[in-house]
Amino acid sequence: VNEVKHILIDLDGTLTDPKVGITTSARYGLNKVGYPIADHENIDWIIGPPLKASLAKIMNVDVTHDLAEQALLGYRERFAVTGLFENELYPDVIETLKTLKNQGYQLYLATAKPHVYAVRILEHFELLQYFTHPYGSELTGERTNKGDLIAYILEKEQLNPAECLMVGDREHDILGARRHGIETVAVEYGYGSEQELNLAAPKYKIKSFKQLLDLLT
């Protein structure tokens, strides 16, 4: 991975484990629109991909359906206040980001999460200082697609894809980066199953975030 100068990093399932906040807020939003989810039902698969589409899938309606929008608004009502911080850092994240920055890499957050939430989470965990710029989606839905988000970052920052690396935990991180000719690293501790990651076929897989340092040396 010699030419790498810029590292695009996913948030949920890569830097932080947002399971409690996201799933509890999703249950809240779905319940508000009359779709209660049983406690024993696992909805961890919603962590990472564009949320509105996942909520629509649970309710078995089209993503353009008003119910999907209403469930998303209900989700945000709880997430923006409480869910945001029902979240924890994965091991060695701070030390690894600090080392990468000190080694001269430019780090960019690349999350499908709305930018306004992503920045608050980075500030909460004191991670913002390590990023050249944090990129996320808009509350209106633009750039929730990982490929679109990556295209936007490349254009805004005038980056050469050959000098970039994408680090994430789900197939859309890998596929979105590949669409733009960017090498990929999948973290195995996030929310992408082994099967999902095998099918996405990232160039590298790591078992802990700090293994990124070994890849880059």
Which residues does each PLM region occupy?
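Short, acidic loop-to-helix structural element flanking the phosphoryl-transfer center
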Residues: V81-L109, H115-V119, T144-G147
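Helix-loop "lid/cap" segments that line or gate small-molecule binding pockets
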Residues: G29-L30, P50-T64, I121, I153-L154
